[in-house]
Amino acid sequence: MKKEFDFILIGRITIDFNPTDYYNNLENSSLFKKYIGGSAANIAIGLSRLKNKVGFFGSVSDDQFGNFVLNVFENEKIDISRIKKTKDHKLGLTFTEMLSEEKSTILMYRDNVADLQIDVSDIDLDYILRTKILVISGTSLAKSPSREAVLKALFLAKNNGIKVVFDIDYRPYSWKNLDEVSLYYQIVAQNSDLIIGSYEEIQLTSRFCLENPENLIDDDYAKYWLKFVDLIIIKNGKKGSKLYQKDKKLVAKIVPVKMLKGYGGGDAYASLFLDHYLKNESDLENGLALATSAASIMVQSHSSFDLPDYQKILEFKDNALKSDPDLVQKKEWNAFKK
């Protein structure tokens, strides 16, 4: 059956305000540029720019900011037929504080936000059956009714042979406590095909299913989660990232660059990797090299969604490999070998 969409995403949409008078405290910043934000929104835009057909389950405010989001999505050729407007809730606002090349913080306003108002009635099987891959962003599990909507989408996809990607995307705001986080993350992770998360996010996801998870290393987590998923990526900031399958382990370094800000690379990383995973799953080494290259490009950019075209990323990756042929290394690995 021919699929209309390559990817459908469900998750966070926000409005970002990034200072143009950066390397300054927020209290001293007076000039800001407005962008669409939120991990799921950024990844959707990245995937669409890579010539994928993209859909989205979401909820936005019924106001000027909601209209801004829908206009951006339409301009980026993302289907908005399953994005509803809510009159009683506002989109979350994110103000970024770019203190230096290395240090950035965020100030968020996420009380009763619009993106968490997607409901089980907004999720329909017909739309899910039209995609090859469903991408779930973990922030959408933070509160009801969004978390129930996500779980419905998850199980509809799983029961109908649609691949599920879980991008953990942990943000402490909106959650009541860590037990709640770990519980819902574990449910989704154990029913996914692919997990992407930082070491800290994987640790948080594993609190109820592994003993003393704080004492475990990447390999330990991979051995456990590969009982459920086909592939797991564990990111470790400046130390790079690792990709695991049952019989494959790849270790990727970062590409050193002069940073403008200390955030924004993760969404570009996910966009490039998922694009390559769908189109050329047999060559994951190249996919990981593209992903880590895209992340390095994005930390030089003022926004978190302004992904350059594929040719520029490819050229950046090729130059990085010339400088360091061991940018991505294959390691001996078998997850279930005694």
From Swiss-Prot:
Keywords: ATP-binding, Kinase, Nucleotide-binding, Transferase. Gene3D superfamilies: 3.40.1190.20, putative 5-dehydro-2- deoxygluconokinase (2.20.150.10). It comes from the Bacteria. Signal peptide: none annotated. The keyword Kinase applies. One of its GO terms (molecular function) is 5-dehydro-2-deoxygluconokinase activity. Pathway: Polyol metabolism; myo-inositol degradation into acetyl-CoA; acetyl-CoA from myo-inositol: step 5/7. Its EC number is 2.7.1.92. Pfam families: PfkB (PF00294). It catalyses: 5-dehydro-2-deoxy-D-gluconate + ATP = 6-phospho-5-dehydro-2-deoxy-D-gluconate + ADP + H(+). PANTHER family: 5-DEHYDRO-2-DEOXYGLUCONOKINASE, HEXOKINASE FAMILY MEMBER. Catalyzes the phosphorylation of 5-dehydro-2-deoxy-D-gluconate (2-deoxy-5-keto-D-gluconate or DKG) to 6-phospho-5-dehydro-2-deoxy-D-gluconate (DKGP). Belongs to the carbohydrate kinase PfkB family. NCBIfam families: myo_inos_iolC_N (TIGR04382). This is 5-dehydro-2-deoxygluconokinase. The lineage of its organism: Bacteria, Bacillati, Mycoplasmatota, Mycoplasmoidales, Metamycoplasmataceae. The gene is iolC.
